[in-house]
From Swiss-Prot:
Keywords: DNA-binding, Nucleus. The keyword tRNA-binding does not apply. This is Major basic nuclear protein 1. GO terms for cellular component: nucleus. Residues 1-20 are annotated as: Disordered. Signal peptide: none annotated. Gene3D superfamilies: IHF-like DNA-binding proteins.
Length: 113
């Protein structure tokens, strides 16, 4: 592996965990606590799911949906600031870092296929 690649991989690190990852029961409770959520209405649960999952990923940096998928966030290092020519004009580019969100299949899902 090239030295630049190794340095880039070392620079990528998981964000600091602010809390404990939500369990299956915690996820069900988050759905139940949503305003105007009724057990009989399946449509509302599907609308509440993305909001609950997004909030959990923002809070802890990862979320596991048992038997399906694990979502993780990674911090990518900042790109270098500088000047670049675009269409004959000099453009100033700011240094920017990113939080990358990736989803991985869980082992139980891999073995089923």
């Amino acid at each position: 592996m090239a030295p630049k690649m190794k340095a880039a991989m070392k620079a990528m690190k998981a964000p600091a965990m602010k809390g404990k990852a939500m369990t299956k029961t915690g996820l069900a409770e988050a759905w139940r606590r949503r305003p105007s959520f009724l057990r009989r209405t399946a449509g509302q649960s599907w609308r509440a799911w993305p909001r609950s999952c997004a909030a959990e990923v923002k809070k802890t940096g990862k979320l596991t949906i048992p038997g399906l998928v694990m979502v993780k966030t990674r911090k990518k290092p900042a790109t270098k600031a500088g000047k670049r020519e675009m269409f004959g004009k000099v453009v100033l580019v700011k240094a920017s870092c990113q939080d990358v969100v990736k989803a991985y299949p869980v082992k139980a899902l891999k073995t089923d296929f």
